Amino acid sequence: LFPFCSPHLTIKKWPYYNNLIKNISDKFGHEYKVVTAPGPSEIDDAKDINALALLDNGRALDISQLTSLIKNSSFVVANDTGPAHIAAHVGAKGLTLFGKHTTAYKVSIERENFKAIQVTDLNNLKAEKVFERLTNFLS
């Protein structure tokens, strides 16, 4: 999971990652390990996410480590951030969440295995909808 965004672009931040994590845990138990890889300025914020934060000796993963993690993930869910674009371009399965800041079409992020959910307001996008799309990919 990549639940973070630039501090000056909080409009890109979906607030229901912990709800999604609960849905994943309730349905799949320990079948999938839910992790996040915070950037350097996101390490403290990662403590608020109910997922394992992957770090390299207390520091953010470098771009090579991050790309490897994404490429080897079963599924990625991300805000419209750098890791989402990496996921799309390395062929990872996943979803990226877009509010009104831009469209998936404008940034050319959608691929065969990587799709977007576009809504007017990310605050109104419920975890159940994201979870439903996620489970469709995994089944």
What does each of the following model-derived ranges do?
Residues 1-9:
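Conserved donor-binding/catalytic core segment of Leloir-type glycosyltransferases
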Residues 9, 58, 119-122:
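Pocket-edge positions in alpha/beta enzyme catalytic cores
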